[in-house]
Structure formats: C-alpha cells, structure tokens
Regions:
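Alpha-helical segment of the N-proximal tetratricopeptide repeat
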Residues: 8-40, 130
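Inward-facing hydrophobic residues that define packing positions of alpha-helical scaffold repeats
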Residues: 31, 38, 69-72, 76, ...
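Structural signature of alpha-solenoid helical repeat junctions
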Residues: 13, 44, 116-119, 123
C-alpha cells in the first residue's frame, strides 16, 4: 500500500496513532505524509479536518482547504463529544501577557497542527485565520473581510491581505 492508497480508515488505537503521526509530519513539513495519516484515521472532528486543510493549503490545493475548514468550523460548533475540540472551556477573561498578544497579532499565520486539547476559542481562531488565507487565494475577498472583522481586525497578516483588496 502506497501513499494515499486505497487503505480504509482505521478505527480505535491505531486511529489515534495515525492522528499523532500526522501531527508529527506537520511539524516536519511532510505535508503528503501528514495528509495521508489524517485521511486514514477514522477521526471526523474539527482538529482532523483543520489538519487536513493545513496540508492542502501548504500544497496549494486551496479549494479543498477551504471546504475542509468550513467543515472544521461546523464540527467545532457541533454537540459536545461529537467532532469538536473538548480542550479547555472557552474563557473570555483568559488573556495571555501583553508581549504574547502583541507577538500573536504581528505574526504570520501559524503553520501548527490543531490538537483535540486546544481551547475552543483558540481552535476557532486558527480555523478562521487559515480560512481567510485560503479565501484570499480563491479571490473570495468579501469572505476575507468578514473573517477579519470576526477576529476583530487584530491580525497584521489579515490586514496585509485586505490592503490589495481595498485598493
């Protein structure tokens, strides 16, 4: 069986191992191997869909990336226990120190995997930031504006996407 072969999805402990392997491959920039692991895992949740989307984005398959991110956002809002990031509950008062907030706002989109333990608000932010990037490449400029507004216009990389649109 080769890469992206016709292996059926794997359930149980092996599914968890495939997810973990996919995360490791993302960290190494091995996008094809990571994508294959996530496809073969039987996970149908927001972290898996986001991680697949990140692999698609990095290989310039923007249409599929965008589709997977829409599904990840929908799964994130699903009922607890079915396709969402259980992680730490959302805490609107939770704020990192100022230095971290500045760094985050000024940084490019992180190319990191989404883990099941990620707090819901942080997961949604990662999903939306990547979705804005994919929408920009698909020339869906109104969606980029909408996402930037949803995120409070606080990310410099989104401002940079909006500059050529608004000219």
């Amino acid at each position: 069986m080769g890469l992206l072969g016709s292996a059926p999805p794997t359930a149980g402990v092996d599914s968890g191992r495939l997810f973990a392997a996919g995360v490791t491959y993302i960290c190494c920039g091995a996008w094809t191997l990571a994508y294959d692991c996530f496809v073969r895992s039987a996970h149908e949740d927001a972290p898996t869909r986001y991680n697949q989307a990140l692999c698609c984005f990095m290989t310039r398959w923007y249409e599929e990336c965008h589709r997977l991110l829409a599904e990840a956002e929908r799964l994130l809002d699903d009922k607890p226990g079915k396709g969402y990031c259980p992680g730490v509950p959302s805490m609107s008062q939770r704020q990192p120190p100022e230095a971290f907030r500045r760094w985050d706002a000024d940084s490019e989109l992180p190319r990191c995997p989404l883990l099941p333990e990620t707090p819901r608000d942080d997961a949604l932010t990662l999903i939306l930031r990547l979705r804005a990037e994919a929408a920009f490449r698909l020339k869906r400029y109104e969606e980029v504006r909408t996402i930037a507004a949803r995120l409070g216009l606080r990310y410099k990389h989104l401002e940079n996407l909006l500059k050529p649109i608004d000219r």
